[in-house]
Structures are given as C-alpha cells and as structure tokens.
Amino acid sequence: MALLKPLHDLSLRFPDYEKFDLAAQMRRACKSIPANIAEGYGKKRSARDFKAYLANALGSTNEMIVHLQIAKALGYISGEESESFVGDYRIVGKQLTRLLERWR
C-alpha cells in the first residue's frame, strides 16, 4: 500500500492524452496488487485458492515494472524515478514469490 499514493500522484503528471491509457493502466495495476492479496486471503478455502490470487498480484507487480519502464522510455518520468519505483516493485515481487513458495 505504501507505493499506491506516490505512484498515483506520479501518473497524474503524465500528458492528458495518456490519461485513459498508460496512466490509467498504471493506476489500476498498482491498486490490484493489494486488492488481490486481500481478496485471496478473504476467500481462501485452500492454499491453492490463495496462491491463485497471489499469482495475480505478482502479475500486476511485473506489469507495473513494465509500465514504469515504458513511462521512462516515453520521457514521462526521470530515470531516477523509474529506478526507484522499479526497485520497490522488484522487492514486492520477491516478497510475493517467497509467500507463494512457502504458503501451505
């Protein structure tokens, strides 16, 4: 959740023509990570069920990394901003991967 507000604010700086494209995709992807974890935990009837939601959260994490790289390539964010957010999302990805591997 700590990344949600800074990422949302970052996406609002994108050009108007990206409002319903890359910026919106980024906002949806960053929100889906904690939402999938919470929904999966709330609906867990088995380890398999919860892991499916964790896998979706991991997919959204990887999607965020790509969106940030695209935003950098298009000049919407600086290299520093991209590296910082990408590093944070890589950490989230590693945490989700470990949780997926260890959840019983």
PLM features: residue spans?
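Amphipathic alpha-helical assembly/interaction segments
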Residues: M1-R104
